Amino acid sequence: MKRPPPLALTLGDPAGIGPQLAAEAWRRLRHSGEGIFFWLGDPRLVERAVPVTCIATPEEAAAVFADSLPVLPVPCEVEVIPGQPDSRNAAATITSIRQAVEYALAGRAGGVVTNPIAKHVLAAAGFPYPGHTEFLAALCDMPGEEIMMLASPQLRVVPVTVHVSLRRALETLTTERIVQVAEIANAALRRDFGIMSPRLAIAGLNPHAGEHGMMGDEEITIVQPAIDRLRAQGIDCRGPMPPDTMFSDKARPHYDVAICMYHDQALIPLKTLDMEEGVNVTLGLPIIRTSPDHGTAFDIAGPVTETCRADVSSLLAAIWLAGEMSAYREGRGS
C-alpha cells in the first residue's frame, strides 16, 4: 500500500510553546508508525532537545521520522526569546503557514496542523487577516467558504458567526448563513469523518430557543426557515434546540454536530467537556487543517529541552485527527 503523505506542522509563534510541542509530539509519535509529520520551523529552536534532520522536500520526512525530527527550515529573522514575542519574526510564522498550505494543495502533505499564533504580533507586522482560518481560505482562493469546527471525543460544534462581537454576531446572523454553514458541516462529516448519515442539531439563539417568540423571534424568523431548507435537501437536522439543554449527557448522543449561533455558545460547552483534547478544524476548504485548541502560552514558554513544560495532548489530538481525515479522503478510513 502506498504510504500516505506526511502532515505539515507549522512553526506558530516561535516565542510560544509551538517549538516545545513540535519536539514533544515527535518524541511521542516517532515509533508509533502513525502521525508522521515534518515541522516547518527554525531548527535552531529544537536541535538541543531532539535529533533533527533538515529536509528539502516533504517526501524525505517518512524515511527519517523514527530517528529524528524532520525539519523543513524556515529561519527566524531575529533571536527568539521564549515568552517574548517579536513582530520581526512574524515573517517566519507566515511563511511556515504559506508553505504548508502549498504542500497540502499539491498533495505533498496530507494535511496542515497549525501551531498557535499570536494575532496581535502578526497584526503589528502588517498581517491583514484576523486569524489562521481567514488566511488559509485566502491561500486556497476560497474566501468566505471556510467554517470553524471544534471537535473532541465527546462533542463537535460549529459556530455560525465566529470572531466578531456579540452585537455584530446578532446583526450578521441570517438564514442563508445558517444554511451555508450546515451544508458545509454536513458534507465534511461525510467526506472527512466517515459519517454517512450526519445528524445535525441546530441551536436556538435566545433563552429556551425563544419560547415561541416570547423571548425573541429569531428562532421563528431566521433559524426555523434555515432548518426547513436543510430538511428539504434531505439533511437530517433537528431544532431549534434550547442551548441550555442540548449539550447535556442525554442530548449529545443524538447528534453528530451542533450548529451554534455564535462563538461562545459553541466553545464554552466543548472546552468545559474536554479542554485538553479539543481540536480546531477548518472545514469548507480543499485541504485538511487542524490545530490544538489553545494559544501560544507565552507565560510557560521556555527553551526547548528534553522535558516539555507544555501539555501536548491537544496537538497530538490535532495530528491524530488530521491523519484520520486524510485517510477518509483517500478511502483508507476505519
From Swiss-Prot:
It catalyses: 4-(phosphooxy)-L-threonine + NAD(+) = 3-amino-2-oxopropyl phosphate + CO2 + NADH. One of its GO terms (cellular component) is cytoplasm. Signal peptide: none annotated. It is an enzyme of class 1 (oxidoreductase). It is found in: Cytoplasm. Keywords: Cobalt, Cytoplasm, Magnesium, Metal-binding, NAD, NADP, Oxidoreductase, Pyridoxine biosynthesis, Zinc. Its EC number is 1.1.1.262. Binds 1 divalent metal cation per subunit. Can use ions such as Zn(2+), Mg(2+) or Co(2+). GO terms for biological process: pyridoxal phosphate biosynthetic process; pyridoxine biosynthetic process. Pathway: Cofactor biosynthesis; pyridoxine 5'-phosphate biosynthesis; pyridoxine 5'-phosphate from D-erythrose 4-phosphate: step 4/5. A divalent metal cation binds at H163, H208, H263. Catalyzes the NAD(P)-dependent oxidation of 4-(phosphooxy)-L-threonine (HTP) into 2-amino-3-oxo-4-(phosphooxy)butyric acid which spontaneously decarboxylates to form 3-amino-2-oxopropyl phosphate (AHAP). Belongs to the PdxA family. Homodimer. This is 4-hydroxythreonine-4-phosphate dehydrogenase. The gene is pdxA.
